[in-house]
């Protein structure tokens, strides 16, 4: 007896109930994927709404023309919102006016362990929103520093970084070294210090003459007093003079014009100052605070 090969027509057809189970399983998978996408979309939508509400309240408190940037970290958002506990919120804003002096202050803040019931966020009750740990920075531009006494006596005030060694000792006729505040070791980010060097330059009137003066000073963060202090160390004449050496009598008369102090209580993010960094044209103050109200961040 000769056997013949089995053809496709000879194979048993799948049962109708098996086909139905396969289609039903695919429908469940598709439905599950759609449900997950809807939940993720709802989560991101709710987070965006909360970020918008916080941004609007911060805009009102900080007297801004535009909404600041607010990012609520962590996923899923809804579990954080329902519990009123947020692990990490980032807030950044620029162009913040402070009192009648500063007009263009920039703020960056990292808020951790935030207690913010959803009802308080939607109702704008910022006093009920508390921050467990706050790490922030406030950047003040040279144009704003020039509005603070006694720096307001200096015309065309400019700010540049310098090294502590150069501020204290000069260079005995050599050019100023590259500031350590701009870069530390290769591949590493800038590091903040409680004190660092700065070069302040501008024009001052003395004995009826307009003098270009370079002041080499230290900026020091005083955590106990909550202040940032400019401590002038020495002066040099600018390039419009025949010599850079400033006579002792002139130094004594002009040095107080560079002796300034900034209270962090007068700035947004009323923090304890922990570090200061000088960049070309600005000074950045870093600080920390604990157990503060969101409503108090603009004080």
Please annotate each region the language model reported:
Residues 221-299:
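Extracytoplasmic/luminal low-complexity segments enriched in Pro/Gly and acidic/polar residues
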Residues 215-220:
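Hydrophobic/aromatic beta-strand elements that line small-molecule binding cavities or substrate pockets
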Residues 96-102, 204-212, 239-240, 292-297:
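Short, cysteine-centered beta-strand-loop-beta hairpins and adjacent loop/turn segments enriched
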Residues 65-144, 152-205:
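N-terminal beta-strand/beta-hairpin edge segment
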Residues 212-214, 228:
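Acidic, Ser/Thr/Gly/Pro-rich low-complexity segments that form flexible
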Residues 1-29:
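Terminal targeting segments of Actinobacterial cell-envelope proteins
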Residues 45-74:
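N-terminal amphipathic/hydrophobic interface segments
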Residues 29-43:
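Hydrophobic membrane-insertion alpha-helices, especially the h-region
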């Amino acid at each position: 007896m000769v056997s013949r090969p089995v053809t496709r027509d000879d194979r048993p057809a799948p049962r109708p109930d098996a086909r139905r189970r396969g289609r039903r399983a695919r429908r469940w998978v598709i439905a599950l994927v759609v449900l997950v996408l809807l939940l993720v979309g709802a989560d991101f939508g709710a987070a965006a709404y909360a970020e918008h509400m916080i941004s609007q309240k911060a805009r009102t408190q900080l007297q801004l023309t535009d909404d600041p940037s607010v990012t609520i970290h962590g996923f899923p958002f809804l579990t954080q919102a329902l519990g009123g506990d947020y692990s990490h919120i980032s807030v950044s804003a620029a162009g913040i006016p402070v009192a009648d002096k500063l007009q263009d202050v920039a703020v960056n803040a990292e808020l951790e362990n935030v207690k913010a019931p959803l009802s308080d966020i939607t109702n704008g009750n910022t006093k009920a929103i508390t921050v467990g740990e706050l790490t922030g920075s406030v950047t003040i531009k040279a144009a704003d520093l020039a509005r603070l006494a006694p720096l307001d006596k200096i015309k065309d005030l400019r700010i540049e970084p310098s090294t502590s060694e150069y501020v204290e000792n000069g260079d005995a006729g050599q050019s100023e070294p590259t500031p350590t505040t701009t870069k530390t070791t290769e591949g590493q980010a800038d590091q903040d210090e409680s004190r660092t060097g700065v070069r302040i330059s501008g024009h001052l009137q003395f004995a009826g003459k307009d003098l270009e003066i370079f002041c080499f000073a230290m900026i020091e963060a005083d955590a106990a007093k909550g202040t940032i202090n400019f401590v002038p160390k020495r002066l040099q004449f600018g390039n419009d003079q025949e010599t850079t050496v400033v006579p002792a009598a002139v130094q004594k008369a002009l040095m107080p014009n560079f002796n300034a102090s900034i209270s962090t209580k007068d700035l947004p993010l009323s923090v304890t100052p922990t570090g200061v960094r000088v960049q070309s044209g600005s000074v950045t103050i870093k600080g920390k605070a604990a157990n503060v109200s969101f409503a108090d961040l603009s004080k």
